[in-house]
Amino acid sequence: QFILGPRLLGLPLEEWLFFVVIPFCSVFIYEVAKFYLHSIDFQKYVRLFFYLLVLVFSVFAVLSFGKWYTFINLASNVVFLIFVLNVSSFQKYLTHFLIAFLVACVPMFIVNGLLTALPVVEYNGTVFSNVRLFDIPIEDFSYFLLLMLMNVFVYEKSKQLILEKKSS
């Protein structure tokens, strides 16, 4: 009733489109934040925020062992955040990334809230923590953070490699 019908590898077309459209839109929001807020840089505080997030995600990952989606989601965030926080060339992008993430959470909150309030998206309680912000599983926010951070990281690294190649 809520999907078009075509499936690829067992997943609805809409699910596959999510993995293309959302990252593209997120990178756009990130670029807009960089352009309009280029003078804002709270790198020290943002790094501290992300280190605290690593700590919180680590604790909750351990506590959620057995709820496999929650565990893998949080553990993946921990690993990638530690990696990103140790790549010195990416540090200058963290402030704008965090701003873009917070802005991108607004439409994500609205759309995801509608999808989870209606019977469009249902979650298997045996693999999720069942902790929700309104109707949205908290894992959706950490998953979105990871998805957006990976895409922005690859985007910035690709730009850097292209510029280095052009200058040589």
Where are these regions (language model features)?
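Short aromatic-rich membrane-water interface segments that cap or initiate transmembrane helices
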Residues: F2-L17, F128-S142
